[in-house]
């Protein structure tokens, strides 16, 4: 989208789930797209080099949501907050809306997925896990700054994670209302 910009913004590097590197063509695609394997040491190196890092705190569980769950958020991990604290990096929350419409999953085949090296295989109403044309919207919130070192007690970290989760949920709700043409 920024190809023709005179001064394009910094590229946000994504973190791909570890299982993707086991898939023949997917790992090639993610590498060419500038993604890194989702390992804490990769994330820390990128942030210490002042690179932008895009993280989905729901992890792979967030991609396994069924169609009727598409507007909900599953439990967030805590690693992203610990890493932000350790590297003194602000967290910029964003809401990503529309993926549930692009891949309307009605069931996940977990056992079959494990047989082929994936966490699950999504099943859609048309059987194949191929995306439909859909409008995907990404809206960003204001940076969130947290104080600490990343070695805080789990209860303190969970409180910070919950603040981020609530902000992302609010951004997603605002984005859905805008998409539906509802007044804010």
Language model regions located:
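Catalytic core of membrane glycerolipid acyltransferases/transacylases, capturing the structured
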Residues: 1-49, 60-73
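Non-catalytic C-terminal accessory region of glycerolipid acyltransferases
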Residues: 45-184
């Amino acid at each position: 989208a920024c190809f023709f910009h005179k001064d394009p913004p910094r590229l946000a590097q994504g973190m791909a789930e570890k299982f993707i590197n086991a898939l023949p063509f997917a790992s090639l695609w993610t590498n060419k797209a500038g993604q890194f394997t989702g390992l804490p040491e990769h994330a820390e190196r990128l942030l210490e080099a002042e690179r932008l890092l895009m993280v989905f705190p729901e992890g792979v569980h967030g991609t396994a949501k069924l169609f009727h769950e598409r507007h909900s958020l599953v439990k967030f991990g805590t690693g992203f907050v610990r890493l932000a604290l350790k590297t003194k990096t602000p967290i910029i929350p964003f809401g990503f809306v529309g993926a549930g419409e692009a891949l309307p999953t009605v069931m996940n085949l977990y056992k079959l997925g494990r047989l082929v090296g994936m966490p699950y295989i999504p099943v859609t109403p048309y059987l194949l896990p191929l995306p439909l044309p859909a409008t995907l919207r990404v809206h960003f919130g204001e940076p969130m700054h947290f104080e600490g070192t990343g070695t805080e007690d789990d209860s303190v970290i969970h409180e910070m994670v919950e603040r981020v989760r609530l902000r992302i949920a609010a951004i997603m709700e605002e984005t859905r209302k805008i998409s539906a043409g509802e007044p804010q």
